[in-house]
Regions:
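Adenine nucleotide-associated cytosolic modules
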Residues: 1-188
Length: 188
């Protein structure tokens, strides 16, 4: 993500990074294991505005790898995440959408972003969103996660780039029974 922003701005001076990040807007499609943790990292890094979209609610099964707490069970993820992010940095502007991202609303949600992170759980959602972004908002870098929800294999994580599409992960198929969904991979 930071690579995308830095390439957009051709940054060379470290002191400019804080100012640059404070002026940027990052969209996050999905507020689960990847999206909630990316949001926390971006807020801690000083990104000025996040657009976060998700249709799900916090459940007990989310607590081992997502940036939520047990007292937030049953709450919409975007609102629970807002509460948590504001505790990190209340100056960060948050635009929230509680609902499914669709071809009918994706442009309205993400066209004002400098970078968008695809953080959906399911492969079909990832696929349509990547195709939609590259066809409809090709000027906006899209960062996708693939195969990073477990543990181990961290030495195989790579970034593959094609135009404004960045795919981060090891892109290997793993069996959830052998490598369960856990926080370590997402934290990388």
């Amino acid at each position: 993500m930071y690579i995308c922003i830095a390439k957009i701005e051709k940054l060379t001076v470290k002191e400019n990074i804080s100012t640059l990040l404070a002026e940027k807007c990052v969209g996050i499609a999905g507020a689960g294991g990847l999206g909630s943790n990316v949001a926390a990292a971006l807020v801690r890094s000083g990104v000025g505005h996040l657009v976060i979209a998700d249709h799900d609610t916090v459940s007990r099964g989310n607590l081992d790898r997502q940036f939520y707490f047990s007292d937030q069970k049953g709450h919409p993820k975007v609102y629970a995440l807002q509460e948590n992010l504001q505790r990190i940095n209340s100056a960060t502007r948050l635009t929230l959408f509680y609902g499914r991202v669709t071809t009918g609303n994706a442009r309205q949600l993400f066209s004002g972003c400098h970078v968008v992170v695809e953080a959906f759980d399911m492969a079909p959602e990832k696929e349509w969103f990547a195709l939609w972004m590259t066809e409809n908002l090709p000027h906006i870098p899209l960062v996708m996660g693939s195969g990073i929800a477990g543990w181990g294999l961290s030495e195989k994580i790579r970034v593959q780039r094609s135009g404004n599409l960045y795919i981060c992960g090891h892109q290997l198929e793993t069996n959830e029974k052998e490598v369960p969904l856990m926080a370590p991979g997402v934290g990388l």
